[in-house]
Every structure is written in structure tokens, then in C-alpha cells.
């Protein structure tokens, strides 16, 4: 598909700016059940033994608390706790790896928390453990999330020596007052030095995370952040919408409601961000992601072969995803499975059973069909009926008659073009892709649970 500019229609954005899922999975994690057990997981593992493997390892520790954070994390300065955690991870890895014998790992990602909480010896220990138990492709993507306050240049050298070739750095905002109010003060010069050094030593892909909607942010202050980010020139950018949920995330209670930008200011910041980044040469991938036109995500989207999973957008859609560590989520075969979310329960279950499986879901045929539909729309901004009809032996207009009725008002508003061959998301619809996907979500129709999701913008 051709690269489209976003058509910013404020009236439509305000009309459709209600809560909805982010669709890193379908069904979403709200449908996970503790009835899903180890036997169902083992059956899913055996279903597609030829699939390559993507690994995710969750490192929950942080030295400091960022007030905006909604991630599963443990704030501590006691480094020995990471050793205890690695002991449990070793048990889980040694127990899980034989199930995937013969499969090749094409992708590894360390997320958190703060993965660079680990010191050099701990980093090496974990990488050695993974390489000894899994078979990595020579060209595997090996990525890590980095907090610029928690790393030195020599640690970056160490990561590169251990095989890491991709880097994602949380910057959030360059404004000093904003940083102070969210307890995340950082050295701007060092961020530039870090990214430049990463490129010099052979990291092939760099990503910067920003957040809009933080306290004391204004369109003017965020414009400064965007200008500095453009000078950093990362391959990819993620610009997340801050969801203020202090009743759910205790740390957010330290943020004063009065300091937050108004809903209109947030929309102004988003509009400014999209305009600035697209004018700076970035392609809008969708949701909150941007990439350079020559980046593989941008290329894959233009070719209609982009995919999405719990780690975000990816070019590797034919892989099974195995998540390890506390709260980690796996996508194996036609199932989703999540590990214990609390560290105490994680330790106890790994010690007793060798795994930490807490809950999950085995997808029905209908789930799989709808997953394919939603993935095509959210990743590639279009859906061709023919491949769905062929793969699942159905007639699209009949099978999705109710869904197409729900989509009709969105088509009338110009968010999508619908004909007998498929659905094309328009320039107006790109920002509201979650709303478009929601038309095909039967779980939303069955239960009035939309308040449990973040707003789409």
C-alpha cells in the first residue's frame, strides 16, 4: 500500500475517542482464565512444531520508581534480588526449553522493569543460559529495553559483545520540569552519547519511547522534545498516550490531576507529533508507532505483511512467542498463556512445578478467524476477503454480517472504504483503527467491559 498521510478530523476523533482494546492479542488478556492449564499449553506447543521461536524474558526490577509507570515492576536497590530471580528463571528455562527442541530462535527480547538493572555478570549468566538451552539463528534479532539513567557506555559494549543488536530506550520527555514531576530526571547529553555509541558499535536498530499526557506537558514543551528526538534520529519511535489510572497504579497517585494537560491539549500534542514526525520523514505505522521508510516495519506494512504481538509490531508473524519470567505472556499455537503476576507466587510455582503458568485461553475457530481479521486491519490498514475466505472456508459477507452492520456507520463517516473485495482504512481512519477493529470483537458485544481499556487517543 502507498504511504498515507494522516487526515486529522477533530470532530471524528472526538466522536470516536472512547475506551477500547489495543489488540496486542485477540481475544484480549481480559478473557484469560485460570481454567487454562499446563496440559492445554503442552497441546498447543505440539500443534505447530515447525514454527520458529521468539523469546521474551521479563526482568521486573527498577532502581527508581517512575510515577507514570503501569508496568509489572519491583523497585529495589538490593542487587542480590536479581540473583534470586535468575535462579528461578534458570529453573523455568531448563524446564520449558526441551518442549521446543529442534526449533530455531529468530528473536529474543528483554523487557521490564529495567533489564539493564542486571549487572554485567548477571547479563552474561542469563545470555549463557538462553544460548545453552535454545538454538539461535545466526541472524537472530536480539533486543533490550534500556533506561538511560541505569546504564553506562561500557555496559552497552558488554551487551553488544553478548549478541544484542537492537536497542529500545525510554526517554519519555526531554523537558526537565516534566521529568522531575514523574521522578525520571535524566542527562540529555548522555542520551545522545548512548545512541551514537550504540550505532558505532553495531546496533542495527534503535527505538525511542516517548509519552504524551504527562504533568506540565504542553504542545509547546513537547515540540521541544520532538525537535531533540529528530536530532537523535532513531530508526523507530513509540509515542504512547499516558493513561492516568491512580486507583489501579499506586505510583500514579503522586501525580496531581491539576498538573495534567487537558484532553484538548493532549489532542493538540498528538496532532503536532504526527505532523512533525511525518514531515521529518517517518512513516506512521499505526497506533503510537513510527518508523523510517527504509525500516523493515515500514517496508513490511507497505507490502501488507506486518504483524503484531504482545511485544508490538513485528515482521515475524509466523513465530511462536514464549514468554519467561514473572507476568510474561506466551502466544503458542492457538493459545495465549500468562505466568504468575506476583513474584512470590512465581517463585513458589517454579520451585514446585518448574513452570509459572497462571492463566490463559485456548482459541476457538471463531477466535482464530477474528484474530486474522483484526491483525490485518491493525497492521496493514486493509483487509482482503479472499485469503480469509480461502483459509477458513467461509463467505465473508455472510459470516461477518453483524460485524459489517456495526462497521457501516464508520464507513459513512469516512473511516473505511468497504466493497465486495475487502476493507480499506482511509487516512481519516488510521488514527481510529482500534474503533474499526472493535466492530469485529465479539467479546465486546457480549459484555459491557469497555471501561477496562484505555481511550483510543
UniProtKB/Swiss-Prot annotation:
EC number: 1.3.98.3
Described purpose of this protein according to its UniProt entry: Involved in the heme biosynthesis. Catalyzes the anaerobic oxidative decarboxylation of propionate groups of rings A and B of coproporphyrinogen III to yield the vinyl groups in protoporphyrinogen IX. It can use NAD or NADP, but NAD is preferred.
InterPro entries xref list: Aldolase_TIM, Coprogen_oxidase_HemN, Coproporphyrinogen-III_oxidase, Elp3/MiaA/NifB-like_rSAM, HemN_C, rSAM
Gene3D superfamilies tied to this protein: 1.10.10.920, Aldolase class I (3.20.20.70)
Domain of life: Bacteria
Chief place where the protein resides: cytoplasm
Name of the molecule in the record: Oxygen-independent coproporphyrinogen III oxidase
Catalytic function, reaction form: coproporphyrinogen III + 2 S-adenosyl-L-methionine = protoporphyrinogen IX + 2 5'-deoxyadenosine + 2 L-methionine + 2 CO2
Enzyme class of the recorded protein, top EC level: oxidoreductase
GO CC terms: cytoplasm
Localization: Cytoplasm
Gene Ontology molecular function: any one: coproporphyrinogen dehydrogenase activity
Note: The structure carries two S-adenosyl-L-methionine binding sites with only one binding to the iron-sulfur cluster.
